[in-house]
């Protein structure tokens, strides 16, 4: 079966910044440009397997030009838009690159706002910053084997924007968006010895732990990685199989690079010179007796399946919050009974195969998946092909682990965090001590209480650990004397008659083109994956061979016994206790964010696929979470250094103070509406300083300008005056101001909601709201004094002081 390509939707270039001062000028609609971008609503969970990707019903099969609204206006002949800098003639293409890297094309991320990359959120400075940021991202993607030096842009960026270049470059490097990976030019920048006094203990050498450790070493930290297994990689495990003079490498864990657009693991693969094999769309299905499925019946049932998924989306929209307490499985079964149009056994078997595929995509039973949020990560799909990596994903793991200090067979059972550091206790009682720790153990281990935290984790984090689901996928890998299956396909499927066994060997992966030998992999999903945990390996292999012989022997093809076979048991593996996470009934995407939160005043951090709301249950999600936490650890370390300096004099470290400010506002002294306040000085002094934070949500201001007075400015203005965020989501912005305690209390008493408070703040009090950097150095001392006061108030209740350092490991 062949599949249609993912839909592409041309978006009109809608207005953003700045507003148009000439609202009565109307452009010629025929000349209105459009931007063709991948449709983010493409059903990710239906294609995560890397094959049989289908359009949802009613989706366009080809791009359709969409003109901008007639109300869109051309730009003024002279306006603030003329201050937009010109870097090149391809800002639209660079915006698309930013989108694939996880950035909004025309706005800032929360992390950028918190880092204070611009002093005026929403102005021309932000527009120019985004142009520079997108250009840096694009250049990095083009030159990933080289170190991207800031100096190479000195002649390209106007002098008045040097500070924006510095801010963008610093942010992208520190957050792992550029200059990461394993290219020689990147590795030679890693310091031979630590340049910082901070010690970080990383628990777990999976992709998250390796990504974080590698970054932290590059940033100059002292790092040690504690791994319970005898190998690195965690749930990414490439097994070398041998027998009869044959050998092959099979991925028993994470196996598919899901999407190549912007995937950082794709960058690492390219740095290693590894070709990526696109998983071909052809996926024939076979009935329980081994005969091929009728193509027309297959087409009909697949259409019914997609129709019911679409109807389930409409159903949850109509149910509102009630959908949080309903499973996807219950919704699909109800819809099938009322509108399923499945009349024969073959049609029901085919439908159950699609359900098994859906359970594979989520590593969870449909009866456990949340109807409301099971696909909450779909808008962030990387896009692009799904691929196998020749030789297995273990090649990525080995490259990332190179020169990273890893101590194997160290099973962590206790993590303590105190006022001055952390202690990590491993099997045998050995204690590792450091300044900070990063926990990357799988959600299954956290659910089972495999690691004890002292003090106990906050209740909100414990609740999220309990709410999120952690499912199971198992495999049977078989090395044969020769390839007897078709060489023009990478996948084929098999139907079962018993619905409770629908996930049993329902899908086969052919690794013959990428493993170096005749390797075939049978997948076990859903309820069958749990039953498989106790199935004797010989019985499992016999069942697989029976299926294969039922398919191929009627065609006159002999199926030999395998030379070697391996059965996985991820559910009972004590270091994983499952495969990957999903949003269970009662949970939401918020729970991923909560799992990612640090605890212990920035001493204990968390990473892993179950800590990323956008990319859960993926290898690249785990990798990205490690880069994220390396950045967070660095920010907190800088904040502590800044605090130490502030006690002697005000700090000029902007990012460090930004991190301090972010921490302080986690527990504001005063909250009302979208406003929160932290107080400094004496409570009895009405003139004592305070810092106000305002959360601005909802749609951004929309100007109506378009076009340009010069060709070289044309695309820049169109992009940043008209392009809406690709994800079409409302962005929350945070702005700040310094004021007195008395003014803050007056503001709280203003009636009429946030709009009236904003009016009072700006018009009556004459206060200007700015980004973090706009607060200026005067705020740094206030921030530091508030932090010092809070630390002082906690002194009596803090755990005892811990020694810093890493003991010599016992061999």
UniProtKB/Swiss-Prot annotation:
Probable histone demethylase. FAD binds at residues 227, 229, 235, 609. GO terms for biological process: chromatin organization; spermine catabolic process; thermospermine catabolic process. InterPro entries: Amino_oxidase (IPR002937), FAD/NAD-bd_sf (IPR036188), Flavin_monoamine_oxidase (IPR050281), Homeodomain-like_sf (IPR009057), SWIRM (IPR007526), WH-like_DNA-bd_sf (IPR036388). Residues 1-10 have a biased composition (Pro residues). GO terms for molecular function: flavin adenine dinucleotide binding; spermine oxidase activity. Belongs to the flavin monoamine oxidase family. It holds the Pfam family SWIRM. Residues 56-71 have a biased composition (Low complexity). Residues 44-55 have a biased composition (Basic residues). The keyword rRNA processing does not apply. It comes from the Eukaryota. Keywords: Chromatin regulator, FAD, Flavoprotein, Oxidoreductase. Its cofactor is FAD. This is Lysine-specific histone demethylase 1 homolog 3. It is an enzyme of class 1 (oxidoreductase). The keyword Protein biosynthesis does not apply. Residues 1-79, 790-811 are annotated as: Disordered. Residues 88-189 form the SWIRM domain. SUPFAM superfamilies: FAD-linked reductases, C-terminal domain, FAD/NAD(P)-binding domain, Homeodomain-like. The lineage of its organism: Eukaryota, Viridiplantae, Streptophyta, Embryophyta, Tracheophyta.
């Amino acid at each position: 079966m062949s599949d249609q390509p993912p839909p592409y939707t041309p978006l009109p270039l809608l207005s953003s910044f700045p507003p148009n001062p000439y609202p009565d000028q109307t452009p010629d609609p025929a000349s209105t440009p459009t931007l063709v971008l991948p449709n983010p609503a493409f059903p990710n969970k239906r294609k995560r397997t890397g094959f049989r990707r289908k359009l949802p019903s009613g989706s366009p099969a080809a791009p359709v030009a969409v003109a901008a609204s007639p109300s869109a206006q051309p730009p003024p002949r002279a306006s603030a838009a003329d201050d937009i800098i010109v870097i090149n003639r391809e800002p639209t293409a660079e915006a698309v690159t930013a989108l694939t890297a996880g950035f909004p094309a025309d706005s800032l991320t929360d992390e950028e706002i918190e880092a204070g990359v611009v002093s005026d959120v929403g102005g021309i400075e932000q527009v120019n910053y985004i142009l520079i940021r997108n250009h840096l991202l694009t250049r990095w993607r083009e030159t990933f084997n080289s170190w991207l030096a800031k100096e190479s842009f000195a002649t390209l960026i106007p002098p008045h924007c040097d500070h924006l270049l510095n801010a963008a470059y610093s942010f992208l490097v520190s957050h792992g968006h550029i200059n990461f990976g394993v290219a020689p030019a990147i590795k030679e920048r890693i310091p031979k010895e630590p340049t910082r006094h901070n010690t970080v203990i990383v628990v777990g050498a999976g992709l998250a732990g390796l990504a974080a450790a590698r970054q932290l070493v590059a940033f100059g930290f002292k790092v040690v990685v504690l791994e319970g297994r005898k190998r690195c990689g965690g749930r990414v495990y490439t097994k070398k199989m041998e027998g009869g003079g044959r050998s092959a490498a099979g991925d028993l864990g994470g196996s598919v690079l899901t999407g190549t657009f912007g995937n950082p693991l794709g960058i690492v693969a390219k740095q290693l010179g590894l070709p990526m094999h696109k998983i071909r769309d052809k996926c024939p299905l076979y009935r329980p007796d081994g005969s091929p499925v009728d193509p027309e019946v297959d087409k009909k049932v697949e259409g019914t399946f997609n129709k019911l998924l679409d109807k389930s989306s409409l159903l949850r929209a109509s149910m509102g919050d009630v959908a949080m307490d309903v499973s996807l499985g219950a919704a699909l079964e109800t819809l099938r009974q009322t509108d399923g149009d499945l009349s024969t056994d073959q049609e029901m078997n085919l439908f159950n195969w699609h359900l098994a595929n859906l359970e594979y995509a989520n590593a969870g039973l449909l009866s456990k998946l949340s109807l409301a949020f099971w696909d909450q990560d779909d808008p962030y799909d990387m896009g692009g092909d799904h691929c196998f990596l020749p030789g297995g994903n273990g090649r990525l793991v080995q490259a990332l682990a190179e020169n990273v200090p890893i101590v194997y067979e160290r099973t962590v059972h206790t993590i303590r965090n105190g006022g001055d550091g952390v202690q990590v206790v491993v099997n045998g009682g050995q204690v590792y001590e450091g300044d900070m720790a990063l926990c990357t153990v799988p959600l299954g281990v956290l659910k089972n209480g495999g690691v004890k935290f002292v003090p106990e984790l906050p209740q909100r984090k414990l609740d999220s650990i309990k709410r999120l689901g952690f499912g199971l996928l198992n495999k049977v890998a078989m090395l044969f004397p020769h390839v007897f299956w078709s060489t023009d396909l990478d996948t084929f499927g098999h139907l079962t008659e018993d619905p409770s066994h629908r996930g049993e060997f329902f899908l086969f992966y052919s690794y013959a083109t990428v493993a170096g030998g005749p390797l075939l992999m049978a997948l076990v999903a859903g309820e069958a994956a749990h039953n498989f945990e106790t199935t004797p390996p010989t019985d499992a292999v016999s069942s697989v061979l029976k299926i294969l012989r039922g398919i191929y022997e009627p065609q006159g093809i002999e199926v030999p016994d395998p030379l070697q076979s391996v059965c996985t048991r991820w559910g009972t593996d004590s270091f994983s206790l499952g495969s990957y996470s999903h949003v269970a009934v009662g949970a939401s995407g918020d729970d991923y964010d909560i799992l990612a939160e640090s605890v212990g005043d920035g001493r204990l951090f968390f990473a892993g696929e179950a800590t990323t709301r956008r990319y859960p249950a993926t290898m690249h999600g785990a990798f990205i979470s490690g880069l994220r936490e390396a950045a967070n650890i660095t920010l907190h370390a800088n904040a502590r250094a800044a605090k130490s300096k502030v006690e002697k004099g005000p700090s000029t470290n902007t990012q460090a103070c930004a991190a301090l400010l972010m921490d302080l506002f986690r527990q504001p002294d005063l909250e009302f509406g979208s406003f929160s306040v932290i107080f400094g000085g004496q409570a009895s002094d009405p003139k004592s300083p305070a810092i106000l934070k305002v959360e601005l949500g909802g749609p951004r201001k929309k100007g109506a300008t378009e076009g340009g007075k010069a060709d070289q400015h044309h695309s820049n203005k169109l992009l940043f005056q008209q392009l809406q965020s690709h994800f079409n989501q409302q962005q929350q912005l945070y702005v700040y101001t310094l004021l007195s305690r008395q003014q803050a209390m007056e503001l709280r008493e203003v009636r009429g909601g946030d709009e009236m408070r904003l009016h009072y703040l700006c018009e009556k009090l004459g206060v200007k709201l700015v980004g973090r950097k706009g607060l200026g150095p005067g705020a740094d001392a206030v921030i530091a004094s508030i932090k010092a006061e809070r630390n002082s108030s906690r002194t009596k209740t803090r755990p005892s002081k811990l020694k810093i350092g890493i003991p010599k490991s016992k061999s």
